[in-house]
Amino acid sequence: MAGSSWPVRLSHQAVTLRPLRRRDEAEWAAIRRRSGNWFRPWDSTRPPGAAEPGMTFGQLVSAFSGRARRGLMLPWAVDYTPPGGRPVFAGQVTVSGITHGSACWAQVGYWIDPRWAGRGIIPTAVAMAADYCFDTLDLHRIEIAIRPENTNSLAVVRKLGARYEGRRERYMHVDGAWRDHDVFVLEAEERPGAVMERLERRLHAPEQG
């Protein structure tokens, strides 16, 4: 296993992945409050009878940072620098369930402030995260699970060239119920070069038809 240490910061053009911080709380809360209807159908929820208590934002950041230092996850904030502007907090990319040994895999989740959607920010951020997992952590496989109705998120995995692997019924508790999810996979052996290179080829390919 290749070595790594948290915190980790990655950048490509106008997009930066950096550790989620306690001082992100105000902007995080403003985004979620302003765009609650955008997020609600896709947000994970606690099933009835869940034993674990909810956490404050600060507690969540502390817990995530501890897991990151132990090599179990990568909890990134996504910063975007608009043309002529200053970096803004635009969303999150979280790599979780990092497993080594005979599996060498992880899961990736993400969200974006709808004000910045459609600019290629999340595909770029996930490509950076995937390349880091493959090249630095020596992972073999990354899974992205998406509700079949989430067309915006499905567009992200299409741009990344992720392979559809199948549907998992009642896979995750989302928006108050156990929901089916489609699973998409990136594998180290299937990428011709970096995931970022593949994304840029797809983004700049000429239109067909």
Label every PLM stretch briefly:
Residues 48-50, 61-77:
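A short helix-loop-beta-strand connector motif used in the catalytic cores of GNAT acetyltransferases and
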Residues 1-27, 31-38, 75-209:
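Acyl-donor (CoA/ACP) binding surface of acyl/acetyltransferases
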Residues 38-62:
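Conserved GNAT-fold acetyl-CoA-binding loop/helix
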Residues 31, 42, 60-63, 67, ...:
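Residues that form generic nucleotide/phosphate-binding pockets
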Residues 20, 31, 49-56, 70:
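Generic, well-ordered alpha-helical segments
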Residues 56-60, 64, 68, 154, ...:
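Solvent-exposed, well-ordered amphipathic alpha-helical segments
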